[in-house]
């Protein structure tokens, strides 16, 4: 069965721009893959433990030498990495906060970049284990970061995502940028009017 992993990381709940667009993507994906399955992971609805010294020690302990306590400490992280390996495709909603990802998304990434789970060491260097999968990123940003925008050079998020997921082996990446979203939250723009061209951009991916 073809499987899509939908990841949301905005703390804005139903008001989230990125979440509405990942949902639109999932609906269109199911139309294109009627026998497929969408697995939803909302990073803002779970309590992720911090990456502390004990977690790092557990992570770098060989699996056959970990204690029961260490395995329990890594259990949620292993659930995340299993979801990534089990999926054939990803759609990932990422709000831009202070020119980077949301805190929830960054913590999730720290949980999933793991030796033997999503990356392995080879004689020629690290090799990502998520190859052969497509990732579509939906970025929502308050300011405008398009090619001709004044702040275009401050879009650090897209190259960062390309670097990180490329390290994990993902080569097929697509981006939908819903920038200028501050106009919605300040009442300068109607939500439906703002979303319309971005919904069209998502649908165009399936044309």
Curated annotation (Swiss-Prot):
Is-annotated flag, keyword Flavoprotein?
yes
Query: What keywords are assigned to this protein?
Result: Flavoprotein, FMN, NAD, Oxidoreductase
Q: Give me the reactions it catalyses.
A: 2 a quinone + NADH + H(+) = 2 a 1,4-benzosemiquinone + NAD(+); N,N-dimethyl-1,4-phenylenediamine + anthranilate + 2 NAD(+) = 2-(4-dimethylaminophenyl)diazenylbenzoate + 2 NADH + 2 H(+)
Cofactor descriptive note: Binds 1 FMN per subunit.
Q: Output the InterPro entries linked to this UniProt entry.
A: Flavodoxin_fold (IPR003680), Flavoprotein-like_sf (IPR029039), FMN-dep_NADH:Q_OxRdtase_AzoR1 (IPR050104), NADH:quinone_OxRdtase_FMN_depd (IPR023048)
Query: How is the subunit organization of this protein annotated in UniProt?
Result: Homodimer.
Q: Which HAMAP family match?
A: Azoreductase_type1
Question: Where along the chain is FMN bound?
Answer: 10, 16-18
The protein in question is named FMN-dependent NADH:quinone oxidoreductase 3
What the entry lists under SUPFAM superfamilies is as follows: Flavoproteins
Pfam families from the entry?
Flavodoxin_2
The cofactor named in the record is:
FMN
Q: What family does this belong to?
A: Belongs to the azoreductase type 1 family.
Question: What GO molecular function terms would the record report?
Answer: electron transfer activity; FMN binding; oxidoreductase activity, acting on NAD(P)H as acceptor; oxidoreductase activity, acting on NAD(P)H, quinone or similar compound as acceptor
